[in-house]
């Protein structure tokens, strides 16, 4: 007999993560073993929050995720400022939309994920406009990989 909590959590399938950018929402997802994060892509902000949320819900369902991790942009001191409060509001709205599908929604500290994603892209030679288009999904991937490594 092995530890039940871990197995039941892993049995819930893949995990998706989002990075809530001002222009784009970056999305990443895990493999079914919950060990490796990959970028899914981005949802361009439409100016309609509900439409954007529904696009995220569609992506999470496409990824067959049982859990969604929403990046929480805490300040450097760990405090929840306006951006973090907005992310918490988005988290609650997504929880209401994804709950009927059995998807758990939680938050994770996303400090430095964008910086780390940008650093990785520069190291790979991706800069400028092309890099800006994928930085949000790369940041979501960094967030998710960190979450997976801690789980």
Regions found by a protein language model. Name each.
Residues 1-16, 23-151:
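Phosphate- and other anionic-substrate recognition elements at nucleic-acid/protein interfaces
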């Amino acid at each position: 007999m092995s530890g039940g909590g871990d197995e039941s959590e892993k049995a819930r399938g893949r995990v998706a993560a989002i990075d809530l950018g001002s222009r784009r929402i970056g999305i990443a997802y895990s493999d079914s073993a919950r060990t490796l994060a990959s970028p899914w892509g981005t949802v361009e902000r439409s100016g309609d929050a509900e439409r954007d949320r529904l696009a995220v819900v569609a992506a999470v369902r496409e990824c067959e995720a049982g859990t969604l991790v929403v990046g929480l942009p805490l300040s450097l001191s760990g405090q929840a400022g306006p951006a973090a409060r907005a992310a918490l509001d988005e988290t609650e709205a997504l929880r209401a939309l994804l709950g009927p599908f059995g998807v758990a929604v939680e938050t994770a500290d996303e400090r430095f994920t964008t910086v780390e994603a940008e650093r990785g892209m520069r190291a790979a030679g991706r800069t400028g406009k092309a890099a800006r288009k994928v930085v949000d999904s790369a940041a979501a991937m960094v967030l998710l990989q960190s979450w997976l490594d801690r789980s």
